[in-house]
């Protein structure tokens, strides 16, 4: 829990410090192709048919996004969100690959809401992976620090219904995964 508090404080501080100066020097202009990536803290939760409560696991998370600008308020693109951790000597990964929309309520500001749908995955090292329907949503703020570059603090949530997962040779029926993510991204507009 300490890691979440520290990362949240750093992200909030970066957003506060950079917002005022960046707004005056580099206006929020969104047009054409955009691309970005980022890293941060993630918390994975699992549920399954007939399972008792499964504890959340904290780990490293990241994302990659790219797409095109539809208007000064709407961006459309594709993104990949991932989470990973070594648990008891086994590498566990979860992720989403989505078609996503980014909505900026006020075009002159950097605040945005995002949502997407696509595919989710879950895999434990040495086992076959599970893939199913996935959703993602979140919010963030593009802190413009250059003409075409922003630091982008984000808070995201992704969910997936990955079906039957495999753990240590055992089939886990009806597995659903979700990841909460807090991170810092780098975006080129």
Where are the model-predicted features located?
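Cleavable N-terminal export/targeting peptides
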Residues: 1-29
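Short glycine/proline- and aromatic-enriched beta-strand/turn motifs that initiate or cap beta-hairpins
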Residues: 23-85, 163, 177-189
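Residues that define the transmembrane beta-barrel architecture of outer-membrane proteins
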Residues: 31-33, 56-62, 91-97, 109, ...
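Residues on the lipid-exposed face of transmembrane beta-strands in outer-membrane beta-barrel proteins
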Residues: 37-41, 62-68, 99-103, 117-119, ...
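Transmembrane beta-strands of outer-membrane beta-barrel pores
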Residues: 39-45, 80-86, 93, 117-123, ...
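Extracellular loop and loop/strand-boundary signature of outer-membrane beta-barrel proteins
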Residues: 49-53, 85-88, 121-128, 167-173
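Repeated loop/turn-to-beta-strand initiation elements of outer-membrane beta-barrel proteins
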Residues: 72-76, 108-113, 146-151
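Helix-adjacent hinge/juxtasegments
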Residues: 89-122
